[in-house]
Amino acid sequence: MTDAARARMLETQLIARGIRDAALLDAMGRVAREAFVPAEFAAEAYADGPLPIGAGQTISQPYIVALMIEALALRPGERVLEVGAGCGYAAAVLATMGARIFAIERHAALAEAARARLAALGLAVRLRVGDGHAGWPEAAPFDAILVSAAGSAVPEALKRQLAQGGRLVIPVGPPGGQTLLRLTRRGPERFESRDFGPVSFVPLLRGVGAAG
């Protein structure tokens, strides 16, 4: 059943909406999304919408995950920082595509569960609890940065951690007015911007989440 649901998701939600990256489609066809959602939502894992994962967070709908990753324009072996790892699904897709993943999650319980899922799948992802606004400076620079929460603006620390030619994909704006942006670094202080349209994400908060 899940293989069939995954195949339908690829055809009706991704390919039908213009997702063309072959490596991305292959990875999303291989990663078991149902392993990344709470058991009570497993039957809805391939539904065309977000699902709650705890701590007030969600796993984005499959199309939005695909849109953001395709916007990164990844090449095999690139170093990628994910801010807002959540349940670990996007990190799993990125790692399956051959990227070297560094992931940050502000909620310790989500990070611990994601780490366990990724390890069980044999995926090498470095994941730590931290404030996504700060990025991961000691591991920088990154070829790509994916931010899975909406900022009021693009955090300057993340821009500084982007390699020359690197791409940063982030939703920006207030609730009800967010847009998905890609910044490509063209020089020390020069960034080229592209708008990928309206989206809706949980906010990118500062600090780490409270325990419990």
Curated annotation (Swiss-Prot):
N-terminal signal peptide: none
UniProt GO cellular component terms: cytoplasm
Enzyme superclass (EC): transferase
Pfam families documented for this protein: PCMT
Principal place of residence: cytoplasm
Molecular function per GO: protein-L-isoaspartate (D-aspartate) O-methyltransferase activity
Membrane-spanning ranges: none
Top-rank taxon, per record: Bacteria
Catalytic activity: [protein]-L-isoaspartate + S-adenosyl-L-methionine = [protein]-L-isoaspartate alpha-methyl ester + S-adenosyl-L-homocysteine
Keywords for the protein's UniProt record, in alphabetical order: Cytoplasm, Methyltransferase, S-adenosyl-L-methionine, Transferase
Gene Ontology biological process terms, A to Z: methylation; protein modification process; protein repair
InterPro entries the UniProt entry points to: PCMT (IPR000682), SAM-dependent_MTases_sf (IPR029063)
Keyword S-adenosyl-L-methionine (UniProt): yes
Localization per record: Cytoplasm
Active site: S60
Coiled coil: none
EC code: 2.1.1.77
SUPFAM superfamilies membership: S-adenosyl-L-methionine-dependent methyltransferases
PANTHER family hit by this protein: PROTEIN-L-ISOASPARTATE O-METHYLTRANSFERASE, PROTEIN-L-ISOASPARTATE(D-ASPARTATE) O-METHYLTRANSFERASE
Family, as annotated: Belongs to the methyltransferase superfamily. L-isoaspartyl/D-aspartyl protein methyltransferase family.
NCBIfam families named among the record's database cross-references: pimt, PRK00312.1
Function: Catalyzes the methyl esterification of L-isoaspartyl residues in peptides and proteins that result from spontaneous decomposition of normal L-aspartyl and L-asparaginyl residues. It plays a role in the repair and/or degradation of damaged proteins.
The name this protein goes by in its record: Protein-L-isoaspartate O-methyltransferase
Species this chain originates from: Methylorubrum populi (strain ATCC BAA-705 / NCIMB 13946 / BJ001) (Methylobacterium populi)
